Each structure stands twice: as structure tokens, then as C-alpha cells.
């Protein structure tokens, strides 16, 4: 969905599925980011720590969402198909500033997707817990 009105038109089962797809789509990029940050010689430890923390929090959120969807639709999780990440572009030069810019872009996309997920979950909470009275 492009906006709040479109999201409100989507059935809650489809919205849950969309959240799972978006979360699953971040598995490989976040693993790659953590691996790449470890290879940067002059990267402060806090950057590596934050990259690992982001990866772990995303995994925990995905696991929680899978449990919720598993209770609503047992057995559907195994049939869920998502597009795997094709990997980093070979066109990205290996110099450190280009890699840092690639991380910035990756985190910008993650932030955008995180906001979408947050909004979808708030919409689901409103529908399912408060009967749409939000």
C-alpha cells in the first residue's frame, strides 16, 4: 500500500503476510551488513555493535510475527514465498567511503520499511484489539 487509506483497505490476514514478507526480505541484507562492518578496519566498535543489534532485533520481531501468524493460520508459514536478496551490487567499488555510503542507503531503506511495519502493526492492533475504534 502506498498510503494509510490503501493500507486500511487490506484485510488483516494480508497485512500480516505483508509484514512477514518485509521482515524476511531483510534477513540477508542485514547479515551482509554485519559481515561487511566487521571487515572495515577503522570502524568503531559501536557501529559493529549497532549493526548486530539491528540484525538481532529484526530477527526477534520476525520470530514474534511468525508465532502470531502461526496461531492464526497454522501451517501457512512454511508455504510463504519471498524474494531473496540478490546480494550487493558488483558495481559498488570496494573503497571504504563507497561501502559506508552503501550502508547508509541500506539503513535508509530499513528505516523506511520499519516505519511501514510499525504503521501496519498499529493498524492491526486498532482493528483486532480495539475493534477499529482508534
From Swiss-Prot:
UniProt-annotated location(s): Secreted
MF terms (GO), sorted A to Z: hormone activity
Alphabetical keyword list: Disulfide bond, Hormone, Secreted
One Gene Ontology biological process: positive regulation of cell population proliferation
Top-level taxon: Eukaryota
SS bonds (residue pairs): 126-134
InterPro entries: 4_helix_cytokine-like_core (IPR009079), Somatotropin/Prolactin (IPR001400), Somatotropin_CS (IPR018116)
A GO term from the CC aspect: extracellular space
Record family assignment: Belongs to the somatotropin/prolactin family.
Protein name: Prolactin
Organism of origin: Bufo japonicus (Japanese common toad)
Amino acid at each position: 500500500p502506498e498510503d494509510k487509506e490503501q493500507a486500511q483497505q487490506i484485510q488483516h490476514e494480508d497485512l500480516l503476510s505483508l509484514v512477514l514478507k518485509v521482515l524476511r526480505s531483510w534477513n540477508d541484507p542485514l547479515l551482509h551488513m554485519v559481515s561487511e562492518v566487521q571487515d572495515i578496519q577503522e570502524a568503531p566498535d559501536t557501529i559493529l555493535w549497532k549493526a548486530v543489534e539491528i540484525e538481532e532485533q529484526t530477527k526477534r520481531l520476525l520470530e514474534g510475527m511468525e508465532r502470531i501468524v502461526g496461531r492464526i493460520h497454522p501451517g501457512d508459514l512454511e508455504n510463504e514465498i519471498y524474494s531473496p536478496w540478490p546480494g550487493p551490487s558488483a558495481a559498488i567499488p570496494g573503497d571504504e567511503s563507497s561501502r559506508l555510503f552503501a550502508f547508509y542507503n541500506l539503513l535508509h531503506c530499513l528505516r523506511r520499511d520499519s516505519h511501514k511495519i510499525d504503521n501496519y502493526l498499529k493498524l492491526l492492533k486498532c482493528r483486532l484489539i480495539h475493534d477499529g475504534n482508534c
